[in-house]
Amino acid sequence: MARMVMCKKLGKELPGLTFKPFPNELGQRIYDSVSQDAWKLWLEHFKMIMNEYRLSPADPRSQEILYQQAEQFFFSEGAQLPPDYRPPRSKG
């Protein structure tokens, strides 16, 4: 049976993560209070941030930006989009 959490992002009880996503206090907070569904939303936001800011996961400064963005995404009103971000055009 899946571990259930009261998801901070989605505001309801849902299956929690099966792993601690970051090796720090923020990773523990996410593990304790973020659902798998909210994590999937984060992964899409994460890809956009990585591409728009041209970040490298191996760079300590890039990691700090990602931690700040994750903090805002999950525990604040939401993360801000990069200033020059243009959403992808839908095909059709």
Curated annotation (Swiss-Prot):
InterPro entries: Fe_traffick_prot_YggX, Fe_traffick_prot_YggX_sf. GO terms for biological process: cellular response to oxidative stress. GO terms for molecular function: iron ion binding. The keyword Iron applies. The keyword S-adenosyl-L-methionine does not apply. Pfam families: Iron_traffic. One of its GO terms (cellular component) is cytosol. Keywords: Iron. Could be a mediator in iron transactions between iron acquisition and iron-requiring processes, such as synthesis and/or repair of Fe-S clusters in biosynthetic enzymes. Belongs to the Fe(2+)-trafficking protein family. NCBIfam families: PRK05408.1. This is Probable Fe(2+)-trafficking protein.
